[in-house]
Curated annotation (Swiss-Prot):
This is Sulfite reductase [NADPH] hemoprotein beta-component. It is an enzyme of class 1 (oxidoreductase). Component of the sulfite reductase complex that catalyzes the 6-electron reduction of sulfite to sulfide. This is one of several activities required for the biosynthesis of L-cysteine from sulfate. It catalyses: hydrogen sulfide + 3 NADP(+) + 3 H2O = sulfite + 3 NADPH + 4 H(+). NCBIfam families: CysI, PRK13504.1. It comes from Erwinia tasmaniensis (strain DSM 17950 / CFBP 7177 / CIP 109463 / NCPPB 4357 / Et1/99).
Length: 571
């Protein structure tokens, strides 16, 4: 089964990275977190606990806007936690929404709720004393934050398509089952945060193992023709195949991922490989087989090279696929036909086949806060008080008020309009996205969320000047090469390099099935806009009918396509 292109070993020998020691010594993710909670001398978690809390859905951060000032005053950084909820498929009840709204107001520094492009929400600025109450509040309304970060299967995404209600419901149920099946089995989360008793049994992790996965692992369930979840950014993807509106099985695609390391040619973005079709009866077996193969074969000697995409490139997709078949006791059928036509959200009211109405609201950057002229956060809380359906968070950082009966439509719309939740914005703004970056993300090299709104305004001006103001280009900004903003699946992707400076990538497409190539490196906003002015001008004049900007940049030879990223991503 070997292939000359993939000569690598199944297991990489060598000195394990320190994260492997940390996991092994953590007593199944307990570490000293419980003791650290009572240490009032510092606002943060110390030593191994700083990393272990990630398995419990939290990152330790500080406010980078005031970091230098505090250092000058000989003060510690102002530590606070970011907490990310586990919310497979992004669906919440109004009761859950009201609970998180109140917590954000009462118990976080910033008072905001951040919707993310992984279909969940984050709290930023939770002080150490409020961490345990945060987990307990989630538990009281049937939520948790287990395994939303670090070396586990993260929050499972599912296409947000409320119109095809029956098919979406079936896909969503599978997203939930996958999430539950691949969760850590340790009782550490319940013991530490929910005060559940320590049971005198030995912990076991039959799927994840004692040292969990080599690196983060991301899963999607996607319902064509909508690629709103950006499947090619993920390790394991189940593409729904329907017959007569009912789900019959899935195509499996494995090994996508966007994270890179500036200047490290051994890292690259990669689209997922098609493995084949499988019936519903085999989904959990196959998912477990993919995860355990990556668990056993993934590189534990180099975290920069540990994700599933690198394992596939080292051993070869066919070898990896054969191992999955062996472990799952099945053989993939040939891929069944599927097509993507869109990945953006459909804004405004749409009526589902169940005769319920669904209102998709554009939430710029996913940040819900009460702005002076637009009390967005209060508006959603007011809607939650009367809404009879559910809320659906999308992978584009927006929110759907779903399942509204005809009799309630007018009341919901009145609240949305009066709180600034239904303002008219351009198609360009609707199709632009950024990660959080400054001031809270410790990895950010450049601004993203705070940079995007005014940058889009300037891009809109360029598009209007060239007569294409009613069109859109998928535009994304990510503050560092880890790529949370998914810029490396955009038509125009900006990757933060240093404060005020970005690498400009061009040549992705509208549906998210192509990696863009770096066009210019380490340039500032004015240089980016000058380049875009020239290229958007050319696109407006030279494009074919219905040709997207990314497709045009390839056809016109502005950039060469990335065809085999392990070998040509950096060319």
């Amino acid at each position: 089964m070997s292939d000359e292109k993939y000569p690598g070993p199944l297991v990489v020998e060598g000195k394990l990275v320190d994260a492997e020691r940390l996991k092994k010594q953590s007593n199944y993710l307990r570490g000293g977190i419980a003791e650290d909670l009572h240490d009032g001398l510092t606002g943060g978690f110390n030593g191994d606990n700083f990393l272990l809390i990630r398995f419990h859905g939290m990152y330790q951060q500080d406010d980078r806007d005031i970091r230098a000032e505090r250092a000058e005053q000989k003060l510690d950084a102002r530590h606070a936690m970011m907490l990310r909820c586990r919310l497979p498929g992004g669906i919440m009840t109004p009761r859950q929404w009201l609970a998180i709204d109140k917590f954000a107001t009462d118990n976080t520094i910033y008072g905001s709720i951040r919707l993310t492009n992984r279909q969940t929400f984050q709290f930023h600025g939770i002080l150490k004393g409020n961490v345990k109450p945060a987990h307990q509040m989630l538990h009281e309304v049937g939520l948790d934050a287990l395994a939303t970060a670090n070396d586990v299967n993260r929050n499972v995404l599912c296409s947000s398509n409320p119109i095809e209600s029956e098919l979406h419901q079936e896909a969503y149920e599978w997203a939930k089952k996958l999430s539950e099946h691949l969760l850590p089995r340790t009782r550490a989360y319940a013991e530490i945060w929910l005060d559940q008793e320590k049971v005198a049994t030995t912990d076991e992790e039959p799927i994840l193992g004692e040292t969990y996965l080599p690196r983060k692992f991301k899963t999607t369930v996607v319902v064509p023709p909508h690629n709103d979840v950006d499947l090619h950014a993920n390790d394991m993807n189940f593409v729904a195949i329907a017959e007569n509106g009912r789900l019959v099985g899935f195509n499996l695609l494995v090994g996508g991922g966007l994270s890179i390391d500036h200047g490290n040619k051994a890292t690259y973005a990669r689209t997922a490989s098609e493995f084949g079709y499988l019936p519903l009866s085999k989904i959990l077996d196959v998912a477990e087989a993919v995860v355990t193969t990556q668990r056993d074969w993934g590189n534990r000697t180099d975290r920069k090279n540990a994700k599933t995409k690198y394992t596939l490139e080292r051993v070869g997709p066919e070898v990896f696929k054969a191992e999955v078949e062996r472990r799952a006791g099945m053989t993939f059928e040939p891929i069944r036909p599927y097509e993507f036509t869109t990945r953006g959200d459909r804004f405004g009211w749409v009526k589902g086949i169940d005769h319920k109405w669904h209102l998709t609201l554009f939430i710029e950057n996913g940040r819900l806060l009460d702005y002076p002229d637009r009390p967005l956060k209060t508006g959603l809380a007011e809607i939650a008080k009367i809404h009879q359906g559910d809320f659906r968070l999308t992978a584009n950082q927006n929110l759907i008020v779903a399942g509204v009966p005809e009799s309630e439509k007018e009341n919901i719309e009145r609240l949305a309009l009066s709180h600034g939740l239904m303002e008219n914005v351009s198609h360009q703004r609707e199709n632009s996205m950024a990660c959080v970056a400054f001031p809270t993300c410790p990895l950010a090299m450049a601004e993203a969320e705070r940079f995007l709104p005014q940058f889009v305004t300037r891009v809109e001006a360029i598009m209007n000047a060239h007569g294409v103001g009613d069109e859109h280009i998928v535009l994304r900004v990510t503050g560092c090469p880890n790529g949370c903003g998914r810029a490396l699946l955009a038509e125009i992707g900006l990757v933060g390099k240093a404060p005020g400076r970005y690498n400009l990538h061009l040549g992705g497409n509208r549906i998210g099935t192509r990696i863009p190539r770096m066009y210019q490196e380490n340039i500032n906003e004015e240089q980016i806009l000058a380049t875009l002015d020239e290229l958007i001008g050319r696109w407006s004049q030279e494009r074919n009918a219905d040709e997207g900007f990314g497709d045009f940049t390839l056809r016109a030879g502005v950039v060469k396509p990335v065809l085999d990223p392990a070998r040509d991503f950096w060319q």
